[in-house]
Design a protein with these regions (language model features):
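Active-site-adjacent loop/helix segments that line or gate small-molecule/cofactor pockets in enzymes
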Residues: 137, 164-178, 212, 231-242
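Short beta-strand/strand-turn micro-motif
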Residues: 152-170, 183-190, 241
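Short, catalytically relevant binding-site loops at active-site mouths
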Residues: 137, 161, 168-171, 178-180, ...
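Short acidic, glycine-rich loop/turn motifs
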Residues: 77, 156-158, 235-237
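Residue-level signal for well-ordered, solvent-exposed loop/turn and beta-edge residues enriched
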Residues: 70-72, 160, 198, 253
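Core alpha/beta nucleotide-donor-binding catalytic domains of modification enzymes
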Residues: 1-122, 130-131, 135-151, 250
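Conserved beta-loop-beta connector loops within the AMP-binding
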Residues: 119-122, 158-164, 196-199
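Basic, glycine-rich polyanion-binding accessory segments appended to enzymes
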Residues: 185-188, 192-255
Length: 255
């Protein structure tokens, strides 16, 4: 039996992906897909059919902690850890998910797949977004929205115009390559102003920051803190962990 969740996928994942890029942000559609489709519609359907849980091939682990009364999400224990794309799950969702590949390495999984005669055993790894073709996300956005991206100005941090960009959806914070303009020395995207249709560029060192604002928070393993707590954090996949201070703010975000 095939469960058709294509409309949910389009509405929750693809539409949101396009909206975020055109607002000057860089989304992670896998996070949204896991929360709303794989462990949203699919998990709901499984439970309605009387099943206890859904098992997937994510490299992660979930376990119940009787001392805190909470389900905790753990890293997959391998170089292919995928726990970061599962952070948006709720306690109710985690209670009904199993991750049988936890603690295994990718080559172990491939070997088991070969033994079972599965045709995907030697399929290459993919880090690409599943619904974006090889032409890249910019071309996809133009096709999906039916409108070409609007050119605008590259500016420095004082507002001085440095050149022209080909649409804010083509750029992301920290980007240096592929700007399409030669500036004589390295320039990095430090901010995207969607309201003004401007891409703000800075020189070496200006692409770093000592703090950030985080939203869409999920305190999976702990009760939401009332004050600052010491944590380790990483700002992107495969970046090293770093000590940090998390300060909850009144609007539900955190610094």
């Amino acid at each position: 039996q095939v469960l058709d969740l294509s409309e949910d996928f389009r509405r929750h994942v693809v539409d949101a992906f396009a909206q975020e890029y055109l607002a000057g942000r860089t989304p992670n559609p896998c996070v949204v897909c896991n929360r709303t489709v794989k462990f949203g519609g699919m998990l709901d359907y499984a439970l309605e059919q009387g099943m206890d849980c859904v098992a997937t091939g994510h490299y992660a682990h979930a376990a119940y902690d009787p001392e805190t009364g909470r389900w905790k999400l753990y890293r997959g224990g391998s170089a292919k850890d995928q726990s970061y794309v599962l952070y948006g799950l709720s306690q109710q969702q985690l209670a009904h998910i199993r991750f049988p590949l936890w603690g295994m390495e990718k080559e172990q999984v491939r070997a088991l797949a070969r033994e079972a005669g599965l045709p995907v055993a030697d399929k290459g790894d993919s880090m690409e977004i599943c619904f974006v073709p090889k032409g890249g996300h910019a071309a996809f956005l133009e096709w999906y929205t039916g409108a070409p991206m609007k050119p605008g100005d590259f500016v420095d941090e004082t507002g001085k115009v440095l050149g022209r960009h080909q649409g804010i959806g083509r750029y992301t914070i920290g980007q240096r390559k592929g700007l399409g303009v030669a500036f004589g020395r390295p320039r990095y995207v430090v901010r995207i102003d969607a309201a003004r249709n401007e891409v703000v560029l800075g020189e070496e060192g200006r692409q770093t920051a000592s703090s950030l604002l985080a939203d869409d928070l999920r305190y999976l393993s702990i009760v939401p803190p009332c004050g600052p707590i010491r944590i380790t954090a990483r700002i992107r996949y495969q970046a090293p962990d770093a000590p940090a201070l998390l300060t909850p703010l009144a609007d539900g975000t955190a610094r």
